[in-house]
Amino acid sequence: MKILVISDIHGNASALSAVAKRERDVDATIFLGDAILSGPQSNAVMGLLSELQPAVSLMGNHDVEVLDPALFAGWPPEWVALNTWIIENLDAAVPEVIGKWKCSHDFEIDGLHFFLHHGDIKNGAESPLPDASDATFEILKQGDHSSTVLFGHTHVQFEKLVNGVNFINPGSVGQSRCGKRVACYGIFQDGIYEPRQVDYEPSDWLSDLEKIQ
């Protein structure tokens, strides 16, 4: 079985489309959150996600902001204006779809047991980056006993073994932080994980960005 793991699309349908085209033969998709804010192709992203039909979708911190715009009211004015424009131009059904997504969640597929978490840790804890303390990753797994934790949020593609638990971040599809213009994601093929990256053409994304008023 081939399982696609994606996270942090952030309104970049050009990047998500490149992933979907490269991995046409996946049997299932796991989405770890942050679909649309703050990118110009939000409706297209939601359409592509619908086509992928994720077996499970998580609600990331920016997805929560779609449902409660007051959460970004204190941001710099430019960001407030951008997010407001995106939300006002969403297809009417999008908030209802996002509202059905899960928070942190146990998930089993093809004999694999995962704990899924978007990756945003509250209460002042450090971000779960590669050099974070083991204690940070213990907070992330919230006492779950799964041997693998899948998470996103930091946009950094990496794996880390902590106290026998494999923590996997597939990286960001739409805003990767690996020093080059690629969409990052992961693949489980018959139970074996592989991080992957694919280049994409950004011209449509840039054109759509220029249309924002």
Predicted regions and their residues:
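Active-site environment of divalent metal-dependent phosphoester hydrolases
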Residues: 10-15, 37-40, 63-67, 124, ...
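Anionic-ligand binding region
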Residues: 131-160, 165-168
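Active-site-proximal beta-strand elements of phosphoester/diester hydrolases
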Residues: 2-10, 113-120, 167-171
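Core catalytic region of metal-dependent phosphoesterases/phosphodiesterases
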Residues: 2-99
